[in-house]
Amino acid sequence: MTQGPPAQLDHAGIARRIPHSGTMCLLDRLEAWTPNEIHCTATSHTHADNPLRSASGLLGPCAIEYAAQAMALHGSLVAAPGTSPSPGYIASVRNVRFGALRLDTVSGALQIRATRLAGGANEVLYAFQVCDAAGTLLAEGRAAVVLDAPIDSPATEGS
């Protein structure tokens, strides 16, 4: 009997399913998911070695990367059994609204949620929301994800 995707995952389990590892895997835990939604938590916004942190701290727009990692994880969970998830990239973000200038000053775990609004084999549209532990909005918006699109490197262009 083949087992389906897990209901919950820790940091190591998430890192095995998304294209980031080590400190660049920002998510700590998969809390819940359905074919259309995902809920993850993270405390990496408080870490001094967060790779997105600048001299000014971890700025609010970095919440988009937290949401993007949740979307990538969701894609791996909904992939057909026995197949690899489609590699993808964020093509655009729209209607983004920030409720905090910095994330590193937020106490408690970030609550990261993404909802699949539409999509097909080559693109997916998600709504995302990042809140603090009390539910205060830190960032929200929509993201268009393009799947299975080869990106030429400068070395291969024109070859």
Question: Predicted segment positions?
Answer:
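Short coil-to-beta-strand transition motifs
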Residues: 19-26, 104-110
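Compact, glycine-rich, soluble single-domain proteins
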Residues: 55-74, 88
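Hydrophobic beta-strand-centered segment that forms part of the acyl-chain substrate-binding groove
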Residues: 73-113
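Conserved positions in beta-strands of structured domains
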Residues: 28-31, 99, 115-117, 131
